Amino acid sequence: MIVGAVAVLLIAWGCDSEPAPSAEVVAAGDIASCRTEGDEATAELVEGIDGTVLALGDEAYPQGTTANFEECYGPSWGRFKGRTKPVPGNHEYYTEGARDYFEYFGEVAGDPGEGYYSYELGSWHVVALNSNCEEVRCGPGSPQTKWLNEDLAANDETRCTLAYMHHPRFSSGEKHGSTGGGVEKLWEVLYEADTDVVFSGHEHNYERFSPQDPQGRADPEGASASS
């Protein structure tokens, strides 16, 4: 399934942080299927890259079951499980409540029923979000949005901020395209908090966007999106 993996060296460019260790991440979504060999090929690339793995959802096709994780994801990208920070995709919810996803990754995936959390990485504040808004609410007043507002407000303003989720706010892909609704609402919160970078998956392609606001207007103060 996977078409590529993105390796990024996170340096606090344009942020007000004091010099701090840089952080290397590998980001990819829509990763493993027993019917294809792409995940094996990209896993070989990741073997040579140190750093945190950001799994952008749809980690195990076709239904995110325990068997899919153990038999398809495990032999390839599962080798990096100890340094992986995942978010759930829509295929994980093909099992009720993404139950098998949460069981496979354990505490690192956040609380079952939520799937969102944050952590520090070098000089960056990193936010993992659950964009499956039909499963966990994403709109104004929802638990996730309330948590996100509080999390970003508590963040040291000298730190750059990176967020990631499965569904892309912006995409030129023909299969799924851009995502509005709750994902746009999450972007609005991120934008107001001056988030710098947002990663996503879902579309099975790779593209980058210049900084923009949640409505897609060019804005040098907006977030740079990559999917």
Give the role of each language-model region.
Residues 13, 169-170, 205:
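Intrinsic structural disorder/low-complexity segments
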Residues 2-12:
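Bacterial N-terminal signal peptides
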Residues 25-27, 53-55, 86-87, 163, ...:
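Residue-level marker for buried hydrophobic side chains located in beta-strands
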Residues 47, 61-161, 174-197, 204-227:
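Extended active-site neighborhood of metal-dependent phosphoesterases/phosphodiesterases
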Residues 15-72, 150, 171-172:
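N-terminal active-site segment of His-dependent metallophosphoesterases
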